[in-house]
Design a protein with these regions (language model features):
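Histidine/lysine/aspartate-rich catalytic loop segments that bind and position anionic ligands
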Residues: 99-104, 108-132
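Feature marks short, surface-exposed loop/turn motifs that line or immediately flank catalytic pockets
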Residues: 41-43, 123, 158-161
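Active-site beta->alpha N-cap acidic-glycine motif
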Residues: 1-109
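C-terminal active-site subregion of NodB/CE4 polysaccharide deacetylases
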Residues: 1-10, 16-19, 48, 110, ...
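Short beta-strand segments
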Residues: 37, 116-119, 154-159
Length: 203
């Protein structure tokens, strides 16, 4: 079993194109997959500032430069996006880009989709207090389990922000595994709360 190479396909956040683009292919070829869900997405509360930043950037470099300024600013990300683009969050865009709970339920009912947690609000856990970290972990898990009637045992660190303290909180929050967004292959004996992935984006 362990001599065979295996691939696990997973998505973070909860964008609707998982349902519209990827799910039909997974159904056709019977491919299992995991969604690490940020519960603000289907709840209609997510401020998808990076999508709106793309719409207000004139080039890939402009987008990347603005993105770096946002991450380096230390201010709330949506607030900094607003400052850079002079544009308020458009929640209609956010809702249209996000999965709905009904779409998630349909994917679960296919028998192919496993749901994990990716916090409530996609906060970088190393940048918030221990109390806020626990809230993000417990409330997202609870929300998913109550809405979808599934057990949530897997977690993905937003922005891959993880340290020993955050990892300890995750381990004490009822999860069995936690993944980063990068790092490469997973091998036998790897830390189950620091599992690596290969990050794939569209060209």
């Amino acid at each position: 079993m362990f001599n065979q190479r295996k691939v696990n396909i997973s998505f973070d956040d909860g964008f609707r194109d998982i349902y519209t683009n990827a799910f039909p292919i997974f159904k056709k070829y019977n491919i299992p997959f995991t969604i690490y869900l940020t519960t603000d997405f289907p709840d209609g509360e997510a401020d998808l500032w990076w999508i709106q930043l793309e719409k207000h950037s004139f080039s890939e470099k402009d987008f990347e430069d603005k993105l770096k300024l946002i991450f380096d600013s230390g201010r709330p990300m949506a607030e900094e996006m607003h400052r850079l683009t002079k544009t308020a969050i458009d929640y209609d865009i956010c809702i249209n880009e996000a999965l709905s709970w009904n779409e998630i339920k349909e994917m679960i009912e296919s028998g192919l989709c496993t749901i994990g947690s990716h916090t409530v609000s996609h906060s970088g856990l190393t940048r918030i207090s221990d109390e806020e970290c626990r809230r993000e972990l417990f409330l997202s898990k609870e929300r998913i389990e109550n809405e979808l009637l599934v057990k949530v045992e897997h977690f993905s660190y937003p922005h891959s922000m993880m340290n020993a303290n955050v990892q300890s909180v995750v381990m004490g929050s009822g999860y069995k595994t936690a993944v980063l967004g990068y790092g490469g292959k997973v091998r036998v004996g790897d830390d189950m709360f620091g599992l690596k992935r290969k990050y794939i984006i569209q060209d």
